[in-house]
């Protein structure tokens, strides 16, 4: 099953032609690898002895100038589960829309190695051709915890990137 090579090629073509792909958690890992995005998954390959957050609430600092932040406060919460991640931009064309809190981002639950993602990108917009890929490192639609992050997901789906950003490439 899965997309296969033809499906990945079609997805790549869709985004490069001006489409928007929104990927959550583990799907972000797929998008990074399949589309060759200039972003590194910061928790990939870490052992559970070094990093393990099985389902906790972390502080999220929102970059207010991001289009994804429309209607959002500067600080909110995010559900970080077993499939969640953090990102490190590795090239041009990556805009950080939200970061995990600095210091100790843990607000509720428990975490091993949370300092590894403190201050790291949690939500990024990545230019890809004339389109973009929006990568969520956390789950913005997890039960009632998501009331704080639904707007980020809705903004990713409904608000186009500013024309100047796409046209200026």
Residue locations for each model-derived region?
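Aromatic- and carboxylate-enriched substrate-binding clefts and catalytic-loop regions
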Residues: 1-4, 29, 42-51, 56
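Short amphipathic C-terminal alpha-helix that caps PH/PH-like domains
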Residues: 149-160
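Active-site-proximal structural scaffolding
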Residues: 4-7, 14-15, 24, 51-53, ...
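Short secondary-structure boundary/capping segments
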Residues: 36-41, 150-152
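Short His-Asn-centered micro-motif
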Residues: 23-26, 43, 64
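Short alpha-beta junction capping motif
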Residues: 1-30, 130, 156
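Catalytic beta-strand/loop cores that center a nucleophilic Ser/Cys/Thr
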Residues: 39-41, 48-49, 56-146, 161-166
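Low-complexity, Gly/Pro
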Residues: 23, 32, 123, 157, ...
């Amino acid at each position: 099953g899965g997309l296969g090579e033809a499906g990945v090629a079609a997805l790549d073509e869709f985004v490069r032609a001006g489409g928007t792909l929104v990927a959550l958690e583990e799907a972000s890992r797929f998008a990074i690898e399949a589309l060759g995005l200039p972003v590194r998954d910061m928790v990939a390959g870490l052992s559970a002895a070094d990093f393990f957050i099985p389902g906790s609430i972390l502080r999220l600092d929102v970059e207010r100038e991001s289009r994804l932040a429309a209607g959002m406060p500067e600080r909110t919460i995010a559900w970080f589960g077993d499939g969640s991640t953090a990102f490190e931009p590795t090239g041009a064309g990556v805009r950080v829309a939200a970061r995990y809190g600095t210091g100790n981002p843990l607000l509720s639950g428990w975490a091993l190695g949370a300092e590894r993602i403190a201050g790291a990108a949690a939500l990024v917009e990545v230019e890809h051709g004339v389109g973009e890929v929006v990568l969520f490192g956390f789950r913005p639609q997890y039960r009632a915890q998501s009331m704080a992050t639904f707007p980020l997901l809705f903004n990713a789906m409904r608000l186009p990137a500013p024309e100047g950003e796409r046209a200026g490439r």
